[in-house]
Amino acid sequence: MAEQVVEILVTGGKATAGPPLGPAIGPLGVNIMQVVQMINTKTKDYEGMSVPVKVIVETTKRTFEVEVGIPPASALIKKELGLESGSQEPKHKVAGNITMEKIVKIAKMKQDAMLAYTLKSAAKEVIGTCVSVGVNVEGKTPKEAQKAVDAGEFDSYFN
């Protein structure tokens, strides 16, 4: 029962048999097109976003299992705002403004994969990601928003 795990990042709903998937899965003896179809079916909700996927191949039986992870926080922020990409100059140009309600929604989606113990801490991690994407939070810079969270200004969202 030899198991091999292949971890890749694919665009939701658009995996192909080409690199990086094909060369990684091909030598393991499973039908690549079946793997691609399953990945595309499981990631269709994340269309256009980068999604971490784990393909677990049972090499002796030539069977496989596909586990789909949650997209990076930056991709979820861009999806919530309908942005193609973040700011090219994050500290100088603002790409958008996100509400605390959407920050909390993203934090709830990502909380299991984060190191944060509380929803408030998870939200602060997501706000930190807003720095690199170039997105303001409730009209404030991400650093100001984190201070406001610490000060209790947004506590109503965490109850």
Swiss-Prot record:
<keyword id="KW-0699">rRNA-binding</keyword>
<dbReference type="InterPro" id="IPR020784">
    <property type="entry name" value="Ribosomal_uL11_N"/>
</dbReference>
<dbReference type="GO" id="GO:0006412">
    <property type="term" value="P:translation"/>
</dbReference>
<dbReference type="Pfam" id="PF03946">
    <property type="entry name" value="Ribosomal_L11_N"/>
</dbReference>
<protein>
    <recommendedName>
        <fullName>Large ribosomal subunit protein uL11</fullName>
    </recommendedName>
</protein>
<dbReference type="GO" id="GO:0070180">
    <property type="term" value="F:large ribosomal subunit rRNA binding"/>
</dbReference>
<comment type="subunit">
    <text>Part of the ribosomal stalk of the 50S ribosomal subunit. Interacts with L10 and the large rRNA to form the base of the stalk. L10 forms an elongated spine to which L12 dimers bind in a sequential fashion forming a multimeric L10(L12)X complex.</text>
</comment>
<dbReference type="GO" id="GO:0015934">
    <property type="term" value="C:large ribosomal subunit"/>
</dbReference>
<comment type="similarity">
    <text>Belongs to the universal ribosomal protein uL11 family.</text>
</comment>
<comment type="function">
    <text>Forms part of the ribosomal stalk which helps the ribosome interact with GTP-bound translation factors.</text>
</comment>
<dbReference type="InterPro" id="IPR020783">
    <property type="entry name" value="Ribosomal_uL11_C"/>
</dbReference>
<dbReference type="InterPro" id="IPR036769">
    <property type="entry name" value="Ribosomal_uL11_C_sf"/>
</dbReference>
<keyword id="KW-0694">RNA-binding</keyword>
<dbReference type="InterPro" id="IPR020785">
    <property type="entry name" value="Ribosomal_uL11_CS"/>
</dbReference>
<dbReference type="InterPro" id="IPR036796">
    <property type="entry name" value="Ribosomal_uL11_N_sf"/>
</dbReference>
<dbReference type="Pfam" id="PF00298">
    <property type="entry name" value="Ribosomal_L11"/>
</dbReference>
<keyword id="KW-0687">Ribonucleoprotein</keyword>
<dbReference type="InterPro" id="IPR000911">
    <property type="entry name" value="Ribosomal_uL11"/>
</dbReference>
<keyword id="KW-0689">Ribosomal protein</keyword>
<dbReference type="GO" id="GO:0003735">
    <property type="term" value="F:structural constituent of ribosome"/>
</dbReference>
